[in-house]
Amino acid sequence: MIQITVVQIDNYGPWTVTPNPRRESDLQALQSRLYCDMNLQFGAHRGLAFYTRFDNIIAITNGIDLETHKRIQNSVKNRYPFTVSMAVASAETAYEAQKLATETIQEYGSAQDDVRKEVLDVANEFVSNGYVQLAHVDINDITGKLTDLETAYDTYLSVQMTKLKLMEELKKYDSMGFFIGGDNFMCPCNGMSEKDFLCMFEDIKESCGIDLKAGIGIGKTAEDASNLADIGLEVIREGKTDFQVYTLKQEIEERKDVTYNYMCPI
């Protein structure tokens, strides 16, 4: 089971134009700061957040309880000109968990409803014995094939096209994909096998002409899984395996509980 939290800014659209449209550079900076905060605060508890649309953030929160969610929510209220609503859900796959969390928030009203404020709810249950499976995917030799040859925008366009195709293919497995900078993607993919990834990469190569590789990490928390995925990707980059997918798994049952600070200093 994987636990997902959907974070949504309350009534954000109307706020950006009230009483007049706010300066775009300020809005972009504000959205980026919220994403930074969410990663720092969930990350302090071994979680991991993805910006998606900035006004909606998806986080992997295995091991993070309701009280910690409330503290993070209060921190946003105290330091930002808006509030956020949160819903938590768990499921066998990442896509299903975010679907349940999204539906829970939607039950309280529209994202632009001025009376819906600081929702905090749990769709089903908090995960105690679940696991997180993450794939760190990147493009083979993007520097030599794109960055050093094409314009910055054309390289960006190729990366975005690859991202879209990757996301579409992952959804077929009830998984998700998020761009994390450069030519890198982080993919919550509970239940997928190495064979699934190899087949998917072949389809993407045929449609986009892009070669991909992936380190897969399986761990108790998002931090554990992402660290293992990063190491797996380095194994491929360093030529220590002939395969384009490499998996590392944490001995979850042997992991000792560690006490973390409730809040990350910002």
From Swiss-Prot:
Name of the top EC class for this enzyme: hydrolase
Catalytic reaction equation(s): GTP + 3 H2O = 2-amino-5-formylamino-6-(5-phospho-D-ribosylamino)pyrimidin-4(3H)-one + 2 phosphate + 2 H(+)
The keyword Hydrolase is annotated on this UniProt entry: yes
Gene3D superfamilies xref list: 3.30.70.270, Nucleotide cyclase
GO molecular function: GTP cyclohydrolase IIa activity
GO terms, biological process: biosynthetic process
Pfam annotation, one family: GCH_III
Summary of the function given for this chain in its UniProt record: Catalyzes the formation of 2-amino-5-formylamino-6-ribofuranosylamino-4(3H)-pyrimidinone ribonucleotide monophosphate and inorganic phosphate from GTP. Also has an independent pyrophosphate phosphohydrolase activity.
Protein name: GTP cyclohydrolase III
Gene designation: gch3
